[in-house]
C-alpha cells in the first residue's frame, strides 16, 4: 500500500492512539476520509475521548458545518494467545454512543462491501473485525461494489426458527443450524452486519413469519 499510495496517504504513526485518532478528526474536518487502524479495539480506550467527544459529536456540535467521515477499524474480542486486556468485545459500548455507526462483518465478501460503504459514509464508523476470521477465505469480486450500512442479510433460509447474530458468531450459528437440521428443524440465519443502526424491520418481519427467534451474541 505504501508503494502504491505513497507516504502522504499511508502513515505509520507512533503507538499513541489518542494522538492519531485526534489527527484523524482534524483531517476529516478538512475534507479527508481517514481510516484509522487500531492494533486491537482494546487500545481504542486510550483514544475514547477523541472518538466519543470529538468524532461522534462534531457534526452536531458544529450545527452541521462539519462532517466527520472517519473509519476506525481493527480486531475485536477474543483470539488465540491473547491476554484478558486484549480480548474484550466493545461492540455494545460503541453501539450505545450517539453519532457512531458500528459494523461487524462475518464474511470476506461482506467485509469489502461494508468497508467501501463505511469509507463513503459522512459519519464516523466503528468497523470491527474478528482476529479469528483473518484466515477465512471466500469469494470476493474484483469489481467495485458496496453493501449499504444498516441492512441485515439472510445467510441461510429456514422455516422453523430464526437465528439472529453477527460477526464471528455467524459461523457458530451455522454449526447449530447443521445440528438442528439433522433433527428436522430448519433454521433461518440473519446476519445483522451492522450493529448500529440495527435492521429491526427485517428481523421483525422474519420473526413474525416463523414465530420463533434465537439471538446469539
Feature-to-residue mapping (PLM):
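Thiamine diphosphate
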Residues: 1-124, 128, 131-204, ...
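Generic preference for hydrophobic/aromatic residues in regular secondary structure cores
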Residues: 10, 152-155, 216
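Short, cationic motifs built from Arg/Lys/His that form the positively charged side of catalytic pockets
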Residues: 128-131, 212
Amino acid at each position: 500500500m505504501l508503494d502504491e499510495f505513497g507516504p502522504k496517504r499511508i502513515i505509520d504513526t507512533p503507538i499513541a492512539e489518542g494522538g492519531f485518532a485526534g489527527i484523524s478528526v482534524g483531517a476529516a474536518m478538512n475534507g479527508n476520509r481517514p481510516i484509522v487502524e487500531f492494533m486491537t479495539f482494546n487500545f481504542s480506550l486510550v483514544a475514547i475521548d477523541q472518538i466519543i467527544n470529538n468524532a461522534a459529536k462534531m457534526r452536531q456540535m458544529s450545527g452541521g458545518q462539519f462532517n466527520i467521515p472517519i473509519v476506525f477499524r481493527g480486531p475485536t474480542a477474543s483470539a488465540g494467545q491473547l491476554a484478558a486486556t486484549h480480548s474484550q468485545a466493545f461492540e455494545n459500548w460503541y453501539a450505545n454512543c450517539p453519532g457512531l455507526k458500528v459494523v461487524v462483518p462475518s464474511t470476506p465478501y461482506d467485509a469489502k462491501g461494508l468497508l467501501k460503504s463505511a469509507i463513503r459514509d459522512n459519519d464516523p464508523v466503528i468497523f470491527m473485525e474478528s482476529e479469528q476470521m483473518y484466515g477465512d477465505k471466500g469469494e470476493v469480486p474484483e469489481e467495485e461494489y458496496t453493501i449499504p450500512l444498516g441492512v441485515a442479510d439472510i445467510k441461510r433460509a429456514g422455516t422453523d426458527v430464526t437465528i439472529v447474530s453477527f460477526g464471528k458468531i455467524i459461523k457458530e450459528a451455522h454449526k447449530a443450524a447443521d445440528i438442528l437440521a439433522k433433527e428436522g428443524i430448519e433454521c433461518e440465519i440473519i446476519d445483522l452486519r451492522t450493529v448500529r443502526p440495527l435492521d429491526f424491520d427485517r428481523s421483525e418481519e422474519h420473526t413474525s413469519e416463523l414465530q420463533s427467534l434465537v439471538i446469539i451474541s
